Structure formats: structure tokens, C-alpha cells
Curated annotation (Swiss-Prot):
Disulfide bonds join C56-C144. Belongs to the Cu-Zn superoxide dismutase family. Cu cation binds at H45, H47, H62, H118. This is Superoxide dismutase [Cu-Zn] B. It comes from Xenopus laevis. The keyword Nucleus applies.
């Protein structure tokens, strides 16, 4: 089993921890808790760079090695880093996601890349405009962190 962790932080009160686990070549289990969010849906994505020198903006665009459009986690036409939305209630999002496109090893590895929680709901590429097909219209980047191996 391969494990990884990401500590999310931003310029405001949003913070959290996300754990990743992968058995052999199987799907990745993503489990996390993010605090300080407004209630409702928030886009959650893996971005291409593990660079947070300019806050979350230097993390680049969504991790998209196959050069596809933005989409929902279950779509065939989606970025590898498109993990959909997390739902906050009482300011806290606790979630468990299983995804078979991201990996903790190999060409789709997310190790050294940045996880980002966004200010708005991800429209999952169904917004009917160009931005929807790039970002899901998920808005600003509230908090982020680089994903690294863990014991």
C-alpha cells in the first residue's frame, strides 16, 4: 500500500488535511476534513505543480496529462485532477472519495502536485461556456497544499 498526505492552508481561515491511499494498481481512496468553508459545494482538484510560492495561484491549472476537457469524476472526458465537489456543513467538509484516474505512482501520480479547494461549486464541465470546460467555474482558490508520501 502507498500512502500520501496533504496539509491545506490558505490566506484566510480555510485549512484541512487530506489522506490518500492506494493498494497495488487500484483506485485511490481520498479522505479528508476541511474547515472554515462556507456551507455548500466547493470544487476540489489536483493541480499540476507542487509550487505554492505565490500562494495557491502558482499551482498552475488542473492536472491534465491527457489534454482533455474538464468534467465530473465519473466522466470519460475529464482532467485526471478533477475530483468534483466536497460538501461543507457547519463550515466543515468531511469527505471520502474513491477515484481510479489519479494514482500515487506512475504517469498519473499526484505526488508532488497540489490539492486545491475552491470557493464555489464545480459545475463539472456542464456550465455551457469555455471556462466550464477548463475549471468548472469553481472560482478562487481558498486553500492548497502539496501532496507528499506518508508512512
Amino acid at each position: 500500500m502507498v500512502k500520501a498526505v496533504c496539509v491545506l492552508a490558505g490566506s484566510g481561515d480555510v485549512k484541512g488535511v487530506v489522506h490518500f491511499e492506494q493498494q497495488d494498481e487500484g483506485a485511490v481512496s481520498v479522505e479528508g476534513k476541511i474547515e472554515g468553508l462556507t456551507d455548500g459545494l466547493h470544487g476540489f482538484h489536483i493541480h499540476v505543480f507542487g509550487d505554492n510560492t505565490n500562494g495557491c495561484m502558482s499551482a498552475g491549472s488542473h492536472f491534465n496529462p491527457e489534454n482533455k476537457n474538464h468534467g465530473a469524476p465519473g466522466d470519460t472526458d475529464r482532467h485526471v485532477g478533477d475530483l468534483g465537489n466536497v460538501t461543507a456543513e457547519g463550515g466543515v467538509a468531511q469527505f471520502k472519495i474513491t477515484d481510479s484516474l489519479i494514482s500515487l505512482k506512475g504517469p498519473n501520480s499526484i505526488i508532488g502536485r497540489t490539492a486545491v479547494v475552491h470557493e464555489k461549486a464545480d459545475d463539472l464541465g456542464k456550465g455551457g461556456n469555455d471556462e466550464s470546460l477548463k475549471t468548472g467555474n469553481a472560482g478562487g482558490r481558498l486553500a492548497c497544499g502539496v501532496i507528499g508520501y506518508s508512512p
